[in-house]
Amino acid sequence: MRNRVRVLKKRANSITWRVRVQMMTRLDPTRPNTTLYDSAPRRPTRLDSTRLDPSQPSSHSLRGSPSHFVVAFSRGRGRIGSLDCAANPTDQSETGCDGHNKMKDIRSQFEKNGFVVLEDFFQPEEIDELKSCGEEFTTNLPPENERKVFNTLELQQNKDKYFLDSGNKISVFFEAEALEDNGKLKVHPRVSLNKIGHALHWLHPTFKKYTFDERVKEAAFQLDYQEPAICQSMYIYKNPGIGSEVIMHQDATYLYTEPVKLVGFWIALEDATQENGCLWIAPGSHKSGVHRRYVRNKDPESKELLVYDRAAPCYQLSNFRPVPVSKGTCILIHGQVVHFSYPNKSDKSRHAYTFHVIETQHTSYSKENWLQPPPGGFLKLYRN
């Protein structure tokens, strides 16, 4: 705690960015037959007082108009210093500006919806620097004999081992549609990669600089993280035409702590739209627990080193809302909120940099997780 206070005192000026508040369909505890997901052949799980409302039309349109707030953080007090409405004053009753009653700070919105949109989190020139570094990886690809395509059960063990070994490295992951079986590219190198992971935040100087930036520390502080640590990082390409779908999931499935205290920082390096594969999030779904785990396989005879502990839930698509954002925006994603993205079939890429932060104080990180800490532990956010 003393270290955190000392770090905060070093900061000179308050940070200002824009928090976007979208009036979406939220939890409806009055509907007794509402379910978040059905998982055959098991009986649908009921969510009691934290149900989602599936009665909304399936067009996925947003209710109401997005509104914006300028948030100036008071570092010394560790809470919001001021909250000024930047939306149309006539819309205050709908957007929640009236008296600051509905949306007072980042934490209240995060706890209510399971995510927060912070616009202008990084400046355009900073985003361009990150994107330039991401594009450099496409000019220095591994040799063909190291570009592996894992498409059979026999090779599943090799796939899992490569994934496990990537935790403390900068590893290259290709798009499935980018390679022939022999490793030759079917597409231009610039659009061949799915992602780079999982230790960019420490092993690459530029990504390290922005991961441990004061704005990141401030956001974690606002979410009441006492001793946060960065456990993984990824550069996501979502290339035009072949950018893969990301299935509906919770981040806590893969990075489980007890109790769960996990937040993802998802930073848009380009405009993310419905056309090029923006995130879709189910507001309030973080209140429904962890639906399944992705763990190390205890069966020594199995070809699979990593397995899910239960079948995939069947989520209702009507519960999800698109979250299109502009370049430079950061979305804070609760570890239990369900989210996904469609394949990118457009002619525009959708690059993003993302990393995950866990609480290390009064929590335990599961030894069953695919990603395990290095000998010295995960890197502490406030101390670097």
Predicted regions and their residues:
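Double-stranded beta-helix
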Residues: 272-337
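Non-heme Fe(II)-dependent double-stranded beta-helix
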Residues: 85, 92-112, 119-246, 379
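Polybasic, lysine-rich low-complexity intrinsically disordered segments
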Residues: 3, 9-10
